[in-house]
Amino acid sequence: MAHENVWFSHPRRFGKGSRQCRVCSSHTGLVRKYDLNICRQCFREKANDIGFHKYR
């Protein structure tokens, strides 16, 4: 078995490795609330477009 066949061959069904950002495909800092699945950096950029507003 070559390294390419073994690398990432284990199925990722749950845990941090199974989810990624819709925008940038990052695995870190995901906002999963309301089924957004966007990392916090992309959320700050796209929040107004999605419909979130800061009231402060």
UniProtKB/Swiss-Prot annotation:
Cofactor or coenzyme needed: Zn(2+)
Cofactor info, note text: Binds 1 zinc ion per subunit.
Residues modified to Phosphoserine: 25
Disulfide-bond pairs as recorded: none
Keyword Transmembrane: no
A single GO BP: cytoplasmic translation
Gene Ontology MF terms: structural constituent of ribosome; zinc ion binding
InterPro entries the UniProt entry points to: Ribosomal_uS14 (IPR001209), Ribosomal_uS14_CS (IPR018271), RIbosomal_uS14_euk_arc (IPR039744), Ribosomal_uS14_sf (IPR043140)
Domain of life: Eukaryota
GO cellular component labels: cytosol; cytosolic small ribosomal subunit
Binding site for Zn(2+): 21, 24, 39, 42
UniProt xrefs under Pfam families: Ribosomal_S14 (PF00253)
Subcellular location: Cytoplasm
Comment field (misc): Present with 5410 molecules/cell in log phase SD medium. There are 2 genes for uS14 in yeast.
Assembly: Component of the small ribosomal subunit (SSU). Mature yeast ribosomes consist of a small (40S) and a large (60S) subunit. The 40S small subunit contains 1 molecule of ribosomal RNA (18S rRNA) and 33 different proteins (encoded by 57 genes). The large 60S subunit contains 3 rRNA molecules (25S, 5.8S and 5S rRNA) and 46 different proteins (encoded by 81 genes).
Family from the record: Belongs to the universal ribosomal protein uS14 family.
Protein name: Small ribosomal subunit protein uS14B
Origin species: Saccharomyces cerevisiae (strain ATCC 204508 / S288c)
Lineage of origin: Eukaryota, Fungi, Dikarya, Ascomycota, Saccharomycotina
